[in-house]
């Protein structure tokens, strides 16, 4: 249900119904989240097919959101005892190599294309010279970009890209999103280790940094203090992975099955959560009609 809740949010559905390539990115992000949950929840050991699936998902990420290929690195931080054998575990490195090779081939091909709709102030070679000549100014711009990333998630409450924004929708939806990230019963058969959580934070930071650097080179005027083009929708995959870091239900509930210990009726609880998600989607859709029509 956690995957389903994030799958029917307003902005991802709106963009998925358009021509934008981010629809592909949203689908892959949901598949990766579901796969990681499955790796920690299934009784069977992690096998070759699991590594192949993650390799395919992250390889496809190359063609839509390149920084997100870093998610393949999470596989090597899953505890060794979750794998069928050491040999299976070491195949993760082959998967990482395949993803990197595909990314390099794509970059080589993509570099041959010339954008025709960029501002005249954008020049990658001159921007690189500026970075090496003014490292302090570049690091300042990058730090500002990193610190402002959480604010960019407000974009999930806009009506068509970044043009119209609802403060009321944001404030009313924030507690619901927070409850899903922190309190939704996410009790997996196998514990998410601190090492995996640390690697998750590292991968998230890497994705944010690389995204900002790419847009500084390709979309920001030479020497400008603010990185242009960074949008909250680019970090949808990171939003999905937050429950692994923020969820505290293992400290609240005791036992392996929420129904058995009488804490709550999971079936009814899930129906309520799904209904809330549908109501938010309906409300945002109605607001969109009010804005544009």
Where are these regions (language model features)?
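Hydrophobic alpha-helical membrane-interfacial segments at the cytosolic entry of transmembrane helices
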Residues: 52-58, 84-109, 198-206, 272-277
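Transmembrane helical bundles and short interhelical boundary loops of multi-pass, membrane-embedded
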Residues: 112, 257-293
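Transmembrane-helix signature of polytopic, membrane-embedded enzymes
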Residues: 1-8
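Short acidic/glycine- and proline-prone juxtamembrane loop motifs at membrane-interface regions
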Residues: 18-25
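Juxtamembrane "helix-exit" motif on the non-cytosolic side of transmembrane helices
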Residues: 12, 107-113, 186-189, 212-223, ...
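Membrane-interface alpha helices of multi-pass inner-membrane proteins
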Residues: 50-66, 71-77
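Membrane-lumen/periplasm interface segments of multi-pass, membrane-embedded glycan/lipid transferases
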Residues: 104-187
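Perimembrane helix-loop-helix junctions
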Residues: 38-45, 70-99
